[in-house]
From Swiss-Prot:
Subcellular location: Cytoplasm
GO CC aspect terms: cytoplasm
Pfam families xrefs: TLD (PF07534)
Primary site of residence: cytoplasm
Provenance organism: Ajellomyces capsulatus (strain NAm1 / WU24) (Darling's disease fungus)
InterPro entries (alphabetical): TLDc_dom
Residue numbers spanned by region Disordered: 167-198, 331-358
Disulfide bonds: none
Protein name per UniProt: Restriction of telomere capping protein 5
Comp. bias intervals (Pro residues): 344-358
Similarity-based family: Belongs to the RTC5 family.
Keyword list, A-Z: Cytoplasm
Free-text function comment from the UniProt entry: May be involved in a process influencing telomere capping.
Length: 682
């Protein structure tokens, strides 16, 4: 086989590539799909496919209509007047590129045949990990190549030309042929001009071909494109994709896409556009006009938007369920004809009923002044709340309203009562205006994900220690607007000194996230008591909950809880140290003083099924959820308040003994500042 594949005959090599493409698609299908899923995929594809010369294929209109994506034409026309959701051309461009994998050099853009669709569904859903050697790293390369449109000739025109040329050149379909030829000259940018990153790209394709004994034909002439690193993604293309991803982020498996893409009000669209602008603002300034390069795209996605493309999974998994397919009719027919009496498992004719997967905002709380669907979608792109299913829209996370400065008052006593009694992870959100010399007000939204409960200062000595960083157990500090910024938690934060907790609460100095806490003593006065910034970033909020200071550092403040921006905690220890050292050389600090308008804390309640814990014998442990624990704590505090009121404060009965009695109670920790939750005054 090797001799045949290494032939110098261009036509035979092209035929070999077509054969390999067919075999690879079959391997993808066998490895990544259940038989029933493949049956539904075939039904969906062939029942809608166009036919030309015996070739069954989809065009852009069919794809957009089936997925429910607005594309400005057909029944999936733009749902918004400004066309910001018209992502049909972008998605079709992506699938036309990915359908040629791993032969983008000679086959992209490819006609969207069934074999191409099989590869597309694998690469755009969670199944990609079964076929890509380096998982997310390889997928980011493929996604960038599928989106890059700057440096290529007009993509839409080329897609149409490629489809027409391919269908016209193949002639009548020969039933004896293993597969029709859909060969074309490929994207101009994919023609090899240099060998930069050749080894990585070759490995990516070889990983897909090594089991097919097809390495020689690949190495001979079909190298993956190298000039993809010289091309760029236009801002318009990325903006449309971001808008679609933000709007469809809550999409559940088999859910209706039109529910999220139609009927959007202007305020809802404005909120989406604010988040899109924030993410785009995180790119290098020059890329706004020239396009987004591979390095910037890869850095942005891998370090601060790791779950950005998660909405594509439920979107393309629609192809794996057909409403028209009902195998129960076939079973009934077989039973009636006496062919078999053996029960045959049948797929459901309607989508199975499953609990809502979107984060549920608990009823009976406050109306948020910060959280809205767009902000929630933005958070889902980088906040991980579960090790097995990181995405908050997929792991059945519930968000519980814990504290609102608007609802509960701008008081640390009230904050303590509501937040310090919450024994579960939480998200802190702050909305306000950046204080500057300019008269123009600039709104900002910052926050922190805290995977551990808020605790008293003295409780931070017992912190988690783990060798393998799990995103759901690492804190993160972030800015949602006006510039998307994520400071990931350092995987070594558990080994930091006890005076460097993730979060710190004090009735005297306020709230501190990611700071060094000076030791308290009788000699410490004034500014000596205030927390100091540390690591890649910190957040300080004064005791009146009126002002905040947000600091982003490239290493000037030494080690800390958070890494500098643009660094991922999943790097090896050597790479992590080198990255932090290179960032530290810039010695840049960005400090924002913020006048707080709203401060909110949202508790995270994981899915009951995902939160189940087992004891030593393997039996499930009965757990009380955070809401019940908080109510129990409040009941305890109420009883303690009644008990304290019943104590005779006069001790000896005289007025002069009142201070003595109060001093004794303070030393016992029953009243006074030492009791962290205090007694809240309303």
């Amino acid at each position: 086989m090797g001799g045949a594949l290494s032939t110098d005959d261009p036509e035979q090599r092209a035929s070999s590539v077509e054969e390999l493409n067919q075999r690879l698609a079959h391997r993808f299908a066998a490895k990544c799909f259940e038989p029933l899923e493949l049956t539904h995929l075939k039904e969906n594809f062939f029942s809608r496919a166009l036919d030309q010369h015996g070739i069954r294929y989809w065009n852009e209109e069919i794809l957009s209509e089936f997925l429910g994506i607005p594309d400005g034409a057909g029944s999936a026309a733009a749902a918004t007047s400004d066309g910001s959701l018209d992502a049909g051309p972008v998605i079709f461009r992506m699938v036309s590129y990915l359908g040629a994998f791993p032969f983008q050099n000679t086959m992209a853009p490819t006609v969207l045949t069934f074999e191409s669709m099989v590869k597309v569904v694998v690469l755009l859903t969670e199944r990609y990990g079964k076929v890509l050697k380096r998982g997310k790293k390889d997928r980011i390369k493929l996604l960038f190549g599928s989106l890059a449109d700057v440096g290529r000739r007009d993509i839409i025109t080329q897609l149409k030309e490629a489809t027409e040329d391919s269908l016209e050149s193949i002639g009548p379909f020969d039933p004896k042929s293993a597969s029709p030829s859909t060969h074309n000259t490929g994207f101009l940018v994919d023609q090899p001009l240099n060998d930069e990153d050749e080894e990585d790209d070759d490995d990516l394709a070889i990983a897909a071909l090594e089991s097919l004994d097809a390495i020689e034909v690949f190495k001979h002439d079909q190298r993956i494109d190298k000039t993809v690193y010289e091309s760029k993604i236009s801002l318009t293309t990325f903006r449309r994709l971001l808008t679609l991803l933000l709007v469809t982020a809550p999409l559940r498996p088999l859910g209706r896409v039109s529910k999220f893409t139609t009927g959007l009000s202007k305020p809802s669209l404005d909120a989406v556009h604010e988040q899109v602008d924030s993410i785009l603002a995180a790119l290098e300034p020059g890329e706004a006009s020239d396009g987004i390069g591979y390095k910037s795209f890869s850095k942005l996605v891998s370090t601060s938007l790791p779950y950005l493309f998660d909405p594509l999974t439920p979107l393309f998994e629609h192809l794996l369920f057909s409403k028209n397919l009902d195998l129960s009719r076939k079973r009934d027919s077989q039973t009636t004809n006496g062919l078999t009496n053996k029960p045959v498992p049948t797929p459901p004719s309607t989508p199975p009923i499953s609990p809502p997967l979107s984060p549920v905002i608990s009823t009976g709380g406050f109306d948020s002044r910060i959280l809205n669907p767009a902000v929630l979608s933005h958070l889902s792109f980088f906040v991980s709340t579960n090790v097995h299913i990181p995405n908050i829209f997929r792991n059945r996370t519930h968000l519980h309203p814990v504290f609102s400065s608007t609802e509960h008052g701008e008081s640390l006593t009230s904050f303590s009562h509501h937040v310090m009694t919450w024994q579960a992870p939480s998200i802190l959100l702050v909305r306000g205006a950046v204080v500057s010399e300019s008269s123009e007000e600039q709104l900002t939204t910052i926050g922190a994900y805290l995977p551990q409960p808020w605790k008293q200062t003295s409780s931070y000595s017992s912190r988690r220690s783990s060798e393998v960083p799990d995103p759901s157990t690492l804190p993160c500090l972030f800015e949602l607007s006006p510039v998307h910024t994520v400071l990931q938690g350092s995987p070594s934060f558990s080994s930091l000194k006890p005076n460097m907790p993730v979060s710190h609460f004090s009735t005297k100095t306020g709230i501190a996230i990611g700071c060094v806490i000076p030791p308290s003593s009788r000699k410490s006065l004034g500014s000596d008591l205030h927390p100091k910034p540390a690591g890649g970033g910190s957040l300080l909020i004064d005791s009146a909950l009126e002002n905040a200071t947000f600091i982003v550092s490239n290493g000037l403040n030494g080690p800390g809880v958070f890494l500098p921006p643009g660094i991922s905690p999943v790097l090896s220890s050597t790479s992590l140290t080198a990255s932090v050292a290179s960032m530290s050389s810039s010695n840049q600090n960005i400090t924002k003083s913020i006048s707080i308008y709203n401060l909110e804390v949202w508790g995270i309640i994981p899915s009951t099924s995902l939160a189940t814990q087992l004891d030593g014998s393997g039996s499930p442990i009965e757990k009380r959820d955070a809401i019940s624990l908080q109510r129990a704590q409040w009941d305890f505090e109420a009883r303690e308040a009644e008990r304290r009121q019943a104590i005779n404060m006069k001790v000896g009965g005289g007025e002069a003994d009142v201070p003595t009695g109060r001093a004794l109670l303070e030393m016992a920790g029953i009243i006074g500042d030492s009791y962290y939750s205090g007694h809240h005054r309303h």
